[in-house]
Structures are given as C-alpha cells and as structure tokens.
C-alpha cells in the first residue's frame, strides 16, 4: 500500500503547478453551470481526489451511479430510456451499442480541446471518430497466487481445464463475451470466431469448468479480496486490478497467457438526454487534461491513452509490463468484436446456465 501512496504523492507533486495554471485559466473562462453532474461509472474507477477537485473548481456536485457489468449498464439505460445521466464510462463494445441505440451524443474535437493530447492510435478507434473520448486501456489476463499455486501460469487452458487443487478456488469475470472469447483461445481457436461449432466447443469447455469456479464476479481490489486472503488462488481479471492487488500481497502475479487476450479501451461519453451538456463536456475535458489523466492512471494502475499524460508518469509505471503490455502480447491480442445476434444468444444462454 505504501508504494501506491508514494506513487500518488509523486505524481500529484509533479503536476501541482500544471494543475494550478489550468485551474486559473478555467476559472477565468467559466460559464454558468448546472449544480450536479450524474456520472455513470464502474465502482472505484476514478481517483476520488480528481472528482473533489472538479467539484471545487466548478462549484458543482458529481454524483456517481455505479454499474457492475456491461449488460447491467444497458439494462439501466433501457429502463431509464437514457434519461437521468450526464456522462458515462463505456467500453469500446458498449460504446458501439450505445451509439446504435442513439443514447450518446457526438463529441467534436473543438468541444474537448484536450483531445489533442491523445495518442492517434486510440483516436482512430473512436466509433466513427465521433463518439467517446478515450479514458483508459488495458488487457484481460490471469492473476494467481504464486506462493499457493507453486507453478507458473502460461496458458488459458490452465484456467479453463483446472487441476484438482484449484477446485473452488477460481474467480471468473462476470462477462459472457470475455469468458467465451478466452475459452476459444484456450481451445486454440480465434477469439473472434463466430463459427457455430467453435462457439459450441467453447461453451462446453465453460460448462466443464463451471463446477470448479468459486465465484462469477469481478475481483474486488482491497485487502479483503479473495486473492489476497487466499480463498481464491487464480482469477480472470483486468490488468490494473491485478496491479493494485499486488500491493496487498507480494505473491500475486499477473500474466497475459501465451495465446494472447482481449484488449479493451474505456471511453467517456455524453448521454444524448443530458440537460447538462456544457458541464458534461467540461468534465470530460478536465479528465483529459494531461496532469489529471496521469494522476488517474497512476491511481488506478491502468494505461492512459493520453500521450501527453504518459510523459508525466514515472518510468517504472511505464515499464511495468502488467500495465503497458509488451509488443509480443499486443501482437497476439485484439479488441473484442461485435458478434451476430444469433451468436450472442448462444453465448448468453450458456453463461446463464453456468452462473445461476
């Protein structure tokens, strides 16, 4: 834990003069704003000090509403008809769906000046270069307790076809598409395959694994996490969460298996039904300021798509392969595809079977 606090302190001190200059300029140009911004976000997925700073700088309150899966995000927006929220954190796959549903508002580069700091490779991933501002990116991999397992994890097969000592000690992400995609990798198939036989084989592998799984949920990132306490020995996990857990236990390891994995990028987007568009744009631009993007990345242990922010981060952070995967990992990995409705139904059916 001390390492995390020291890193946060160093990053904050490095950026304090930059932030003060940015704050003074913003205050001078500030128009009248709404009093509350509703931010639809994953839990524990933003540096709370940045939220407080935005509130103080703008004289507003940021109210976070949390969701725990992409499916729940969609359900929440369907139930509310997209009304009642201003800014949303959306994965690359969710962003495409939200744009098709007409729930999110196009964002121009003029409206978010700090887009100029983004690495062009991430801007090219924006849906039609119109929706969403890159927030954080990373990988899906495996975290495990090296002291308990006493053998290296190198393949997805070790997670999906577990040995007897892992019975009940496995945690799996609560995302049907990622679970099936990596099951395909474990079988030596392409993670993007929509071939019915490939999907059926992956589903059978997941069914066989299910009795050995202790829980289907996103891994908690605190001292009570099952990986920290030893209740779980191995978990499918997002890379930054594994890096955070390393600070609670030195024997937690993170690996992207040799078959490769999914890359992901989360984005900040504006709900079309917002009544606070000016404030929403200001919040997104604030989070995209290089100093703020760097602070957020350091706090959460995820890679930032903000090229100017990377220049402000410590060398040890940028050199950590769990945060910034090496070229060999990137070459065997890719973003999750959109799947045909028929395939999605197959995937969701098997996932419902094993998780209920």
Q: Each predicted region: which residue ranges?
A:
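Early extracytoplasmic/lumenal segment of secretory-pathway proteins
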Residues: 26-97
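A ligand-binding cleft/hinge motif common to bilobed small-molecule-binding domains
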Residues: 94-97, 228-229, 233-251
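A bilobed periplasmic-binding-protein/Venus flytrap-type ligand-binding module shared by bacterial periplasmic
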Residues: 141-148, 185-188, 265-276, 295
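Conserved C-terminal helix/tail region of periplasmic/extracytoplasmic solute-binding proteins
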Residues: 328-356
């Amino acid at each position: 834990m001390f390492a995390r606090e020291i890193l946060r302190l160093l990053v904050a001190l490095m950026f304090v003069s930059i932030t003060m200059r940015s704050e003074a300029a913003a205050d001078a140009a500030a128009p009248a704003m709404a009093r509350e911004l509703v931010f639809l976000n994953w839990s524990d997925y933003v540096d709370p000090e940045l939220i407080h700073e935005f509130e103080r700088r703008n004289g507003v309150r940021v109210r976070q509403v949390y969701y725990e899966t992409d499916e729940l995000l969609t359900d929440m927006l369907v139930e509310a008809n997209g009304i009642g929220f201003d800014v949303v954190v959306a994965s690359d796959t969710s962003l495409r769906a939200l744009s098709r549903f007409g729930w999110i508002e196009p964002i121009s580069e003029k409206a978010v000046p700090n887009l100029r700091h983004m690495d062009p490779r991430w801007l090219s991933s924006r849906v039609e270069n119109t929706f969403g501002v890159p927030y954080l990116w990373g990988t899906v991999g495996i975290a495990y307790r090296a002291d308990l397992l006493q053998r290296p994890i190198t393949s997805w097969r070790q997670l999906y076809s577990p040995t007897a000592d892992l019975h009940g000690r496995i945690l799996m992400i609560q995302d049907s598409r990622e679970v099936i995609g990596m099951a395909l990798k474990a079988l030596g198939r392409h993670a993007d395959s929509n071939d019915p036989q490939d999907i059926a084989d992956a589903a059978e592998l997941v069914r066989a694994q299910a009795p050995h799984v202790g829980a289907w949920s996103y891994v908690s990132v605190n001292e009570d996490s099952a990986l920290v306490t030893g209740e779980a020995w191995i978990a499918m996990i997002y890379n930054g969460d594994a890096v955070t857990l390393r600070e609670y236990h030195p024997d937690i390891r993170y690996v992207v298996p040799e078959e490769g994995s999914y890359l992901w990028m989360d984005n900040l987007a504006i709900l079309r039904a917002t009544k606070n568009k000016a404030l929403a744009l200001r919040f997104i631009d604030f989070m995209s300021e290089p100093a703020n993007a760097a602070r957020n990345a350091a706090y959460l242990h995820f890679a930032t798509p903000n090229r100017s922010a990377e220049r402000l981060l410590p060398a040890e952070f940028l050199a950590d392969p769990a945060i910034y995967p090496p070229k060999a990992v990137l070459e065997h990995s890719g973003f999750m595809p959109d799947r045909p409705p028929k395939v999605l139904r197959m995937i969701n059916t098997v996932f419902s079977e094993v998780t209920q």
